[in-house]
Amino acid sequence: REYVSYTDYAQVNGVELFYAAEGCGKPVILLHGNGGSHNSLETTTRQLAQAGYLVYAIDSRGQGANKKLDEYHYKDMAEDVYQFIRQKNLVKPAVFGYSDGGIIALQLEVMYPGTLGAIATGGANIFVPGALEQSFIDRLYEDENPSPLKKMLMYEPTMTADDMQTIQAPSLIISGENDIILPEHTRLIGENIPDGEVVILPGEDHGSYIKRSYKVGDLILDFFKRIGY
């Protein structure tokens, strides 16, 4: 198998998704955070590709190089990624999602159990009240005219601990000690996934161990090795 490096658009679920593909080997899908793009996870993309994986770094609907939308829902984004997986004939791919991307990964596996071979999330939440730092929630709600992307953060996702118990994939649930996601919420997610583990990183915030950092990639590669992916 040869090393690939290209960008393209996938037509899925009624939208066009820009993505970058890099590497060769077992597939790993990378999903960025709210308002970001595949470039947000450039360091991790390179790191995983160099370690022998085929990375698909996707721009989520209405973000990055994609046409902006008037409204956004995590379930639609999860459906997009599910259809991307089907279209590319990927069998039980691994997914790493940062923030919104992590929500999408969990939502996908809740909607379609058994689709993913492994899940890693950084700074994800499965519901809003009691999951995020209060000051962050207060700031969200102070905005009298929230953007469509921000509006989604205010009211979604709406998953439950019971939903997490249906997730079949081995899962690595990560957040920073000083994350906007409360540590107890990160633990709630990981402890309810049957094959889940939790890592709270000392001294890190919501993005410090991900953006231009090898830390998250090292954790993911170690996780893949342990589960034989």
Name what the model sees in each region.
Residues 18-64:
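Conserved HGGG/HGGXW glycine-rich cap/lid loop of the alpha/beta-hydrolase fold
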Residues 60-93:
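Active-site loop/oxyanion-hole signature of alpha/beta-hydrolase fold enzymes
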Residues 97, 101, 105:
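Gly/Ala-rich beta-loop-alpha elbow adjacent to hydrolase catalytic centers
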Residues 107-111, 119-147:
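Flexible "cap/lid" loop of the alpha/beta hydrolase fold
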Residues 148-163:
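Active-site nucleophile elbow and catalytic-triad environment of alpha/beta-hydrolase enzymes
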Residues 167, 173-175:
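Short beta-strand/loop motif that positions the catalytic acidic residue
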Residues 180-185:
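Conserved alpha/beta-hydrolase "acid-adjacent" motif
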Residues 203-229:
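Catalytic active-site module of serine/aspartate enzymes centered on a nucleophile-bearing elbow/loop
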